């Protein structure tokens, strides 16, 4: 494992922990898109079904379990534990516009037409756009809490580091995965505007608010 992959995993884990702590400490999921969190739970479930059939390393297995457990814990908090604080009025993105196209694309463009490989490919495609309901929610409310901004920034850093991971692997290992790279680029592009706002506002102690 190279440094970019490791730092990317840490950034991803940090994002998840920040979100869980935000919800638990505030006893509220206000400002958090439940739809994005459901999509992430679907992503990790589809991607890590090989948990029972393919052992790579203890680190790899532990991270898979953590991602799945945390994603479903987050969904449970939003739709059950703190349901009264969930802002469903602003969380209105039509997720079928993300799930259906990525599922169809996974059947058409994949590395190997087997159930686990199709599910893995579907998870890669879906993850690249799973944050859209959250970004859409922020655009509707016009602002985001600081801790939510930190969560989104950590996710963006995770994807950016993974792009460097792919470059590293291609250069030193000759490994090239076009599906993962293109999906990663799409996901990183979606964060670009947010990165700018985060750097110019949140890091200066201001609340992230979108231009009118």
UniProtKB/Swiss-Prot annotation:
InterPro entries: ER_ret_rcpt
Pfam families: ER_lumen_recept
Site feature (Interaction with the K-D-E-L motif on target proteins) residues: 5, 117
Topological domains, Lumenal: 1-4, 53-58, 111-116, 169-178
Protein location: Golgi apparatus membrane; Cytoplasmic vesicle, COPI-coated vesicle membrane; Endoplasmic reticulum membrane; Endoplasmic reticulum-Golgi intermediate compartment membrane
PROSITE patterns assigned: ER_LUMEN_RECEPTOR_1, ER_LUMEN_RECEPTOR_2
Transmembrane intervals: 5-24, 33-52, 59-79, 93-110, 117-135, 150-168, 179-199
Main subcellular location of this protein, as a coarse class: Golgi
Key words, A-Z: Cytoplasmic vesicle, Endoplasmic reticulum, ER-Golgi transport, Golgi apparatus, Membrane, Phosphoprotein, Protein transport, Receptor, Transmembrane, Transmembrane helix, Transport
GO molecular function terms noted in the UniProt entry: ER retention sequence binding; KDEL sequence binding
Superkingdom: Eukaryota
Modifications made to the protein after synthesis: Phosphorylation by PKA at Ser-209 is required for endoplasmic reticulum retention function.
Stretches the record annotates as Interaction with the K-D-E-L motif on target proteins: 47-48, 159-169
Membrane topology, as annotated: Multi-pass membrane protein
GO cellular component term of the entry, any: endoplasmic reticulum-Golgi intermediate compartment
Similarity comment text for this entry: Belongs to the ERD2 family.
Protein name: ER lumen protein-retaining receptor 1
Species annotation: Rattus norvegicus
């Amino acid at each position: 494992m190279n440094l970019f992959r490791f730092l990317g995993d840490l950034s991803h884990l940090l994002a998840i922990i920040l979100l869980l702590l935000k919800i638990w400490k505030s006893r509220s999921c206000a400002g958090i898109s439940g739809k994005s969190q459901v999509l992430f739970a679907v992503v990790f479930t589809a991607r890590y079904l090989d948990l029972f059939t393919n052992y790579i390393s203890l680190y790899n297995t532990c991270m898979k379990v953590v991602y799945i457990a945390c994603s479903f814990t987050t969904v449970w908090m939003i739709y059950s534990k703190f349901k009264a604080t969930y802002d469903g009025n602003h969380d209105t993105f039509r997720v079928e516009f993300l799930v259906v196209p990525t599922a169809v694309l996974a059947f058409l463009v994949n590395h190997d037409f087997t159930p686990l490989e199709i599910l893995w490919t579907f998870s890669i495609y879906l993850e690249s756009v799973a944050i859209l309901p959250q970004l859409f929610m922020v655009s509707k409310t016009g602002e985001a809490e600081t801790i939510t901004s930190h969560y989104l920034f950590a996710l963006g850093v995770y994807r950016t580091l993974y792009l460097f991971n792919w470059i590293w692997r291609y250069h030193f290992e000759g490994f090239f995965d076009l599906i993962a790279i293109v999906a990663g680029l799409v996901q990183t592009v979606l964060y670009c505007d947010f990165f700018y706002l985060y750097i110019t506002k949140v890091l200066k102690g201001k609340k992230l608010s979108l231009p009118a």
